[in-house]
Swiss-Prot record:
Name of the encoding gene: ribF
Annotated organism of origin: Mycoplasma genitalium (strain ATCC 33530 / DSM 19775 / NCTC 10195 / G37)
Entry EC number(s): 2.7.1.26, 2.7.7.2
Domain of life where this protein originates: Bacteria
Keyword Nucleotidyltransferase set for record: yes
Catalyzed chemical reaction(s): riboflavin + ATP = FMN + ADP + H(+); FMN + ATP + H(+) = FAD + diphosphate
Name the record gives this protein: Bifunctional riboflavin kinase/FMN adenylyltransferase
């Protein structure tokens, strides 16, 4: 027997896990992508959303591309939902589907075993607000794993290297949520190895870039795919009167990060 979850699943959170754990059926997810109102503040891209669902919900995933299949709610039900042969459907109170924007109450008339979940403080919009307001640790408590980005290391101007802090530079995806500029404590996953460091997010021409200084690491990793997880916000972006002042600020960030990491159970963050 199967339970079908329908939604964007942008940032898998503890609420999703609770629903899965309290369902009697095998989970399936109908993941909605490319909604008609183009969204530019996604927490994660499609690839990461699918990966999180498979990892944490242990669910099979069907992706429905709205842009490629523009249809009304009845057609969506007949062509997409019915073919999945589910025994239960789970949607949120704020969920609307089809180009005629029908809701869960309408769906329940067609499919009796539809569960409509009330919107709570466990939602992607709440998590976005926490990230926007520099309340990173609150966001991370709601997510199934602390907020992260994935990117390829590119060449930079290497100015930080001259100050004694070589960095791995990753260009941020401009379709995702614009993160606040400033310094962060980060965890870096590179070639299945875990490192820690400080990440500095700043604007470089048209791109938002994260320059990450990895502690006790000085290898050349250009072109490598890395996953960097934001653990704690340190400070907002500042202008410095001299290179010496900038170097002092970076060293202060590093010292703060090292002390903070010493006091954490790293297996639980």
């Amino acid at each position: 027997m199967k339970s079908l979850f329908i939604g964007y699943f942008d940032g898998l959170h503890q609420g999703h896990l609770f629903l899965k754990q309290n369902s009697k059926f095998e989970p399936m997810v109908l993941l909605i992508d490319n909604p008609p109102l183009k969204q530019t503040n996604w927490l994660y891209d499609l690839q990461q959303r699918v990966a999180q669902i498979k990892t944490y919900l242990k669910a099979t995933v069907e992706v429905f591309d709205v842009a490629k299949h523009n249809m009304n709610a009845l057609s969506f039900f007949e062509q997409q939902i019915k073919r999945l042969n589910c025994d239960e459907i789970i949607v949120g109170t704020d969920w609307h589907f089809g180009n005629d924007h029908k809701d869960g109450i309408w769906l329940k008339k067609l499919f009796k075993n539809t569960v409509i979940v009330n919107k709570t403080n466990l939602s992607s919009s709440v998590i976005r607000n926490y990230l926007t307001n520099n309340e990173l640790e609150k966001a991370n408590q709601l997510l199934v794993e602390p907020y992260y980005r994935v990117g390829t290391v590119v060449h930079g101007l290497k100015k930080a290297r001259l100050l004694g802090f070589p960095t791995a530079n990753i260009v941020m995806d401009n379709h995702l949520l614009t993160l606040n500029k400033g310094s962060y404590i980060v965890r870096v996953l590179l070639n299945n190895q875990t490192f820690y460091g400080i990440g500095f997010i700043s604007q470089k021409d048209q791109d938002l870039v994260c320059e990450t200084h990895i502690f006790n690491f000085n290898n050349e990793i250009y072109g490598s795919l890395v996953k960097f997880t934001l653990l704690k916000f340190i400070r907002t972006i500042s202008k410095f009167s001299s290179q010496a002042a900038l170097q002092k600020a970076i060293q202060s960030d590093a010292n703060f990060a090292l002390k903070w990491l010493e006091n954490q159970n790293l297996d639980k963050i």
